[in-house]
Amino acid sequence: MSKQSLSYKDAGVDINAGNTLVERIKSDVKRTTRPEVIGGLGGFGALCALPSKYKDPILVSGTDGVGTKLRLAIDLKKHDTIGVDLVAMCVNDLVVQGAEPLFFLDYYATGKLDVDVAADVIKGIADGCVQAGCALVGGETAEMPGMYHTGDYDLAGFCVGVVEKSEIIDGSNVKAGDALLALASSGPHSNGYSLIRKVIEVSGIDPTTAQLAEHSFAEQVLAPTKIYVKPVLQLIKHTDVHAICHLTGGGFWENIPRVLPSSVKAVINEKSWEWHPIFKWLQEQGNIDRYEMYRTFNCGVGMIIALPQEDVETALALLQQVGEKAWVIGKIEHANADEEKVVIC
């Protein structure tokens, strides 16, 4: 009795679809390149030289995902900006230490490869890399039958940057009297989405048709995470930045203490900046208390920067010049060991 000859495609893995995707994304990858990148797509490893301007370079690396914002993007069939989120979550963590992002790699996993969806996602990743000034040097597209529900996929990002050793920003220079400058967020960025999805569920709204503050709810809830690399690197160049905090999971209470010495605390005036409308909606619809809002969401603030009072005017003018909305939201004060590191009043 003759047996049917099985192929990898019969098992659910379409190598031709993967090759088609590679061809589709080549032009997007090409527009992210940097002079330091050696070679192109297709190698077993990606090669990148260190920029020659660094005398004592230190590499800084990071990896992240986009959490359950991805679930919402899949459900709402909006795949073109989730890649920006992926890049943002990685590069914003790097620039906090003063690092210039050099290159980025992605991991895209799915049960059955949809070339159109994957190409949209990777185009978004390339868009994010262009915004951050880093090269998309490689990635992995994993088609894994039986591992994901139909239409689902998962993402992870990996980034490497470089900073001059003498210019690493680690918060050690923060002192009482420093001002706290906040850079506006575009919305929830990529944190708190399990709670956001729960609030959407209990509110009973249809996110595909609902409006919020005269804009599409779907557009606002899926607004891509802001990439702060270029404006923050300019701030570092022209002012004496003492610390930078990327407001991600854990919000104000958990992220700000990560960049403060033990002898100080951050005192923040919550009336000093604007909450994005989506945060007001979430708080009202979910009956979320104040502490939980500040622990889960950025509440309109994507980055907080500690710098001397005398540099505030220069910093605000520079940020305005490049189109960034910013506010002075507080200051650094002396603290005892047993005091809270963050006070919001």
From Swiss-Prot:
The question of whether Cytoplasm is a record keyword is answered with yes
Q: Chief subcellular site?
A: cytoplasm
Q: Which UniProt keywords apply?
A: ATP-binding, Cytoplasm, Ligase, Nucleotide-binding, Purine biosynthesis
Q: What class of enzyme is it?
A: ligase
Give the molecular function GO annotations: ATP binding; phosphoribosylamine-glycine ligase activity; phosphoribosylformylglycinamidine cyclo-ligase activity
Where does the source fall among the domains of life?
A: Bacteria
According to its UniProt record, what is one Pfam family this protein matches?
Answer: AIRS_C
For this protein, the record's PANTHER family field holds: TRIFUNCTIONAL PURINE BIOSYNTHETIC PROTEIN ADENOSINE-3, TRIFUNCTIONAL PURINE BIOSYNTHETIC PROTEIN ADENOSINE-3-RELATED
In Swiss-Prot or TrEMBL terms, this protein is called Phosphoribosylformylglycinamidine cyclo-ligase
User: What is the taxonomic lineage of the source species?
Assistant: Bacteria, Pseudomonadati, Pseudomonadota, Gammaproteobacteria, Pasteurellales
